[in-house]
Swiss-Prot record:
Primary localization class, coarse: membrane
Binding site for heme 1: H157, H225
Catalytic activity: 2 a Fe(II)-siderophore + NADP(+) + H(+) = 2 a Fe(III)-siderophore + NADPH
PROSITE patterns assigned: FAD_FR
Positions with a binding annotation for NAD(+): L419, F420, A421, G422, G423, V424, G425, V426, S427
Protein name: Ferric reductase transmembrane component 1
Upper lineage: Eukaryota, Fungi, Dikarya, Ascomycota, Taphrinomycotina
Similarity-based family: Belongs to the ferric reductase (FRE) family.
């Protein structure tokens, strides 16, 4: 069914949303070129610290924009009334004008009757739902153009979904009110009953999407979210014949995205070594994804969706890749929490050695597990560290979908980098450091602050950090804080070191973010700088507060935050 003239306002609304995003992409690339030019100039002439008045005004405006983007609640409070104000013109409806009760070919400028407005609200909600559906897919072209992850498009997806639900709810209650006033039979009509089902799906979607529910019961959120999405497709399709064309677009987008993801997953089925390092930490290592037509470029800081059939065929979970694109393998640091990760830890733990001393040095034993896809390899190594890893390594069949995220490392275009991580958040920051060092970059100085309570995790990353600082002329300062009950001095393998251009220090206690960031700002001056952080919500909120407190209005600082 083709879209006719009465759908034009909905189509205009969709085009307006996409047009705004395209304009944003254009501004993003202009900003990227500005950063590259300025960073190149600083690399060739470090003494030049001039900042013209036009740049100061631009950076002041960008600082306001950055504050809003990094504080989503405030941005949403501003966006909601603006969106509804813009939506008012789109709920008018052009209808044939009447002359003495007879329709003529003349078209009236608009019909603002209750029935017409209620109908327009329904079509507008339908159009917003289509746009929201587009921003929910993993293979999102806008994310690639913004050198970002599809997860950053989730903000657009969530806000559009909320607007669609609110406008759709107003549409539904408006028709219920109109039916109650004059046409009570409409309250039990087929179209209204389907509307009741849509309303029920809205309630389930809203409750399951609340941050508390999503974080605490992610697996339930995942199932309910997908079931409700499919339910919306079916019920809106059946609700009104004029909605069918919009739902066909959603189905096409869904089939394309799911088809690409399923194909990649089956092409990238492989065996991973899985080790339970500590009760709350899992280390995974496996071959890098195969290159194919449906494969995506791999950039530093990307993440991967994995499925372990021996645990569940229906659950996929995202994990950040701790290795760099130049490696022929991928590494994952997995924090053990409830649900999938806890079951994986239990599975691996049940297959590890019960008594390491019973292993024969000359023998290698492979124990087959009853579940398909899991082998346990037990072998003796010379060092205690290797013994723990090798003897406990379980071979697990994994389906990989990805990588997803930026196709290149945007941080290497900035002169100064401030990187901050908490716990397994290092899996996002470490590849950025290694990639910036290994590839040609415009960066001259890196400050990396990491807080972790796991000495085992510090040990795993220690070798990579040592390699990073030894083979570059770049100025690098790395501060690793052990926040456990015992001091870092008791971990003999963690030794601080320094040279002319680098410093790697292991310290006790929580880091003082304010001091580190103020020192970084002092070193940065007027040059291009970028901040990247990955950690818990509490850690990120503390860092944002620190940045807002100490950053001058004209600081040339790009900010990016990843929550784990």
């Amino acid at each position: 069914m083709a879209i006719n003239s009465s759908d034009k306002w909905t189509v205009i609304a969709i085009c307006l949303i996409l047009g705004i995003l395209l304009a944003f992409i254009l501004m993003f690339w202009l900003e990227r070129f500005r950063v590259i030019i300025k960073s190149n100039a600083h690399k060739h002439d470090p003494s030049d610290k001039r900042q013209i008045w036009l740049e100061k005004y631009y950076l002041f405006v960008r600082q306001i924009y950055t504050y809003l983007v990094t504080h989503k609640v405030i941005l949403t409070l501003i966006a909601v009334p603006v969106v509804f104000a813009i939506s008012i013109p789109f709920i008018g409806m052009q209808t044939p004008a009447s002359s003495h009760g007879k329709q003529t070919t003349q078209v009236s400028t608009g019909n603002w009757s209750k029935n017409a407005v209620a109908a327009r609200l329904g079509f507008l909600a339908c159009g917003l739902y289509v746009t929201s559906y587009f921003f929910s897919i993993k293979n999102n072209p806008f994310a690639l153009l913004l050198i970002s992850s599809h997860e950053k498009m989730n903000y657009v997806h969530r806000r559009l979904s909320q607007y669609a639900i609110m406008i759709g709810a107003i549409h539904g209650f408006a028709y219920i009110g109109l039916a109650a006033q004059g046409k009570r039979a409409l309250l039990t009509a087929r179209v209204t009953i389907i509307g009741y089902v849509i309303l029920g799906l809205m309630v389930i979607m809203i409750v399951s999407s609340l941050p508390f529910f999503r974080r605490r019961f992610y697996e339930w959120f995942f199932v309910l979210h997908h079931m409700c999405s499919i339910g919306f497709l079916i019920t809106i399709w059946l609700h009104h014949r004029r909605c069918v064309v919009y739902m066909k677009v959603c189905v096409a987008v869904y089939v394309f995205d799911r088809g690409c993801r399923m194909l990649r997953s089956f092409l990238n089925r492989s065996k991973f070594d899985v080790v339970l390092v500590e009760d709350d930490l899992i280390y995974m290592k496996g071959p890098r994804p195969k290159k194919s037509f449906f494969g995506l470029p791999w950039g530093a800081g990307n993440h991967m969706y994995i499925n372990i059939p021996s645990l569940s065929y229906w659950q996929i979970h995202p994990f950040t890749i701790a290795s760099v694109p130049s490696d022929d393998f991928i590494e994952l640091f997995v924090a053990v929490r409830a649900g999938f990760t806890k079951r994986l830890a239990k599975k691996v733990s049940s297959k590890s050695l019960s008594d390491v001393s019973d292993i024969n040095i000359s023998d290698e034993k492979i124990e087959k597990n009853g579940d398909v896809g899991i082998e346990v390899m037990e072998r003796h190594s010379l060092s205690q560290e290797d013994l723990v890893f090798e003897s406990s390594a379980a071979k697990v069949s994994v389906l990989m979908d990805g990588p997803y995220g930026p196709v290149s490392n945007p941080y290497k275009d900035y002169s100064y980098l401030f990187l901050f991580a908490g716990g397994v958040g290092v899996s996002y920051i470490l590849p950025i450091i290694l990639d910036t060092i290994k590839k040609q970059s415009r960066t001259v100085h890196i400050t990396f602050v990491w807080s972790a309570r796991s000495s085992a995790l510090l040990n795993i990353v220690h070798k990579s950090l040592c390699e990073a600082v030894r083979y570059t002329e770049m100025n690098i300062n790395i501060f690793c804080h052990l926040t456990n009950s015992y001091p870092v001095e008791e971990v003999s393998s963690l030794n601080s070191q320094s040279a002319r251009n680098y410093s790697l220090q292991y310290l006790n206690g929580r880091p003082d973010v304010n001091d580190y960031f103020k020192d970084f700002l002092h070193a940065t001056g007027t040059q291009t700088a970028a901040l990247a952080s990955c950690g818990s919500d509490k850690l990120l909120r503390h860092l944002k507060s620190c940045v807002n407190t100490h950053s001058p209005s004209t600081v040339d600082l790009y900010q990016h935050y990843e929550e784990i």
